[in-house]
Amino acid sequence: MDSDSKEAAAVIERAMSSVPLSMKVYAPDGNYPEGYNYWGYGTSFNVMLIAALESALGSDGGLSAVEGFMSSARFMQYMAGTTGLAFNFSDARETTQSFPAMFWYASKLGDPSLLWNEKIFLTREDTHFTAEEERFLPIILIYGSRFDMKEVTPPVSKIWTGHGKVPVALIRTGWDKGEGFYVGIKGGTASANHAHMDAGSFVFEAQGVRWAQDLGMQEYYSLEKEGVRL
């Protein structure tokens, strides 16, 4: 594409007109209807597109200003409980992971507290990455170099709420692992992408234990082999 400026321009223009359509899911507050894991998948590519446009063209064409997109980083931070498990509504698993896109958000917003969960995850002895996750790691090198991780402190806030197609309320009494209480509850509809019939489901954690949990996802193949058309 770098040898054909007309073709490159056409692709970029089409992206600039179509990508905002998919970004409407972040409105109004940033809670992502598809849940924990799919936030990492979709938002990471969204961040890379914005970063590439800013680097190459000097502007992202307003993509980062789409309603709810920048607020979504804080939503994602709250989705990890004090046990180290995720609020796994919709097609999501309990296991938490690092999201390199958070380093871009922290840099863009000038808010290193967004990296608190990343700091915890990246310093764990059992930290590992799948091949799918490894492809995003360069984002940490690029944007993480702008922060002294030793000085990253937890957010001051303890409550996060979001409206929209799948509204959520996420409440905690502390940010250190095993500290205090954590409650996550969701509303919404089963018609959202990757949604379950789980409106009203919640997780509750206290003293480092998850006492109430969402059943989470069922592996797709186990359904497809029984003739369920997903």
Where are the predicted features?
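Short glycine-rich loop/turn motifs that provide flexible caps or phosphate-binding loops at active sites
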Residues: 29, 34, 207, 215, ...
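Short, flexible micro-motifs
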Residues: 33, 38, 211, 219
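C-terminal, non-catalytic macromolecule-binding modules
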Residues: 212, 218-230
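Generic structural "secondary-structure junction" signal
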Residues: 34, 89-91, 222
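Carbohydrate-active enzyme catalytic cores, enriched for enzymes
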Residues: 41-215
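Active-site lining segments of carbohydrate-active enzymes
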Residues: 1-37, 140-157
